[in-house]
């Protein structure tokens, strides 16, 4: 589930995240602007400066300023669409994706938009696509190789 302004990430040194078991940090992108749009209510949260970190399990944003309305965002890769990278003519490039299942209970889907005023957007797009593809492969292997639970069935003679 996607989490916004979660207590477990507040109070940490800005730009750092606590990794989960078996989670690897793939890349960090400073000076990002992030906007989260909750659908269908059209409620939006925004931060104009922070670090986006792509890990093997999720996308994490931490704001540079604690006073921002969007302090932290954590989105598991499996709840996010592939996304698209846009290069508008008159503003900073951005990446946009649809995400599902927020923990706050107010919405079951929304959009995340990450702007890159200082560059790095193409690298971000490649990193997150690679992470999502790897997550899909690992998940597929887990589904195929389920653990054997044994049964209480006796043999028939």
Feature map (PLM): residue ranges:
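Short regulatory "switch" loops immediately downstream of catalytic or recognition motifs
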Residues: 36-37, 63, 99-102
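Acidic, Ser/Thr- and proline-rich intrinsically disordered linker/docking segments
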Residues: 1-16, 69, 75-157
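Conserved beta-hairpin
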Residues: 43-69, 73
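Anionic N-terminal interaction surfaces
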Residues: 1-54, 118
């Amino acid at each position: 589930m996607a989490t916004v302004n979660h207590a477990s990430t507040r109070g940490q040194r800005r730009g750092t995240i606590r990794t989960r078991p078996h989670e690897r940090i793939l890349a960090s992108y400073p000076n990002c602007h992030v906007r989260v749009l909750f659908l269908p209510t059209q409620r939006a949260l925004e931060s104009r400066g922070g670090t986006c970190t792509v890990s093997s399990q999720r996308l994490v944003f931490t704001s540079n300023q604690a006073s921002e309305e969007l302090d932290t965002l954590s989105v598991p890769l499996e709840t996010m669409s592939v996304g698209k990278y846009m290069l508008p003519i008159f503003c900073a490039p951005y990446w946009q994706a649809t995400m599902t299942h927020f923990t706050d209970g107010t919405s079951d889907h929304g959009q995340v938009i990450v702007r890159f005023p200082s560059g790095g957007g193409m690298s971000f797009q490649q990193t997150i696509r690679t992470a999502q593809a790897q997550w899909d492969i690992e998940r597929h292997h887990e589904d195929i190789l389920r653990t054997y639970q044994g049964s209480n069935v006796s043999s028939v003679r």
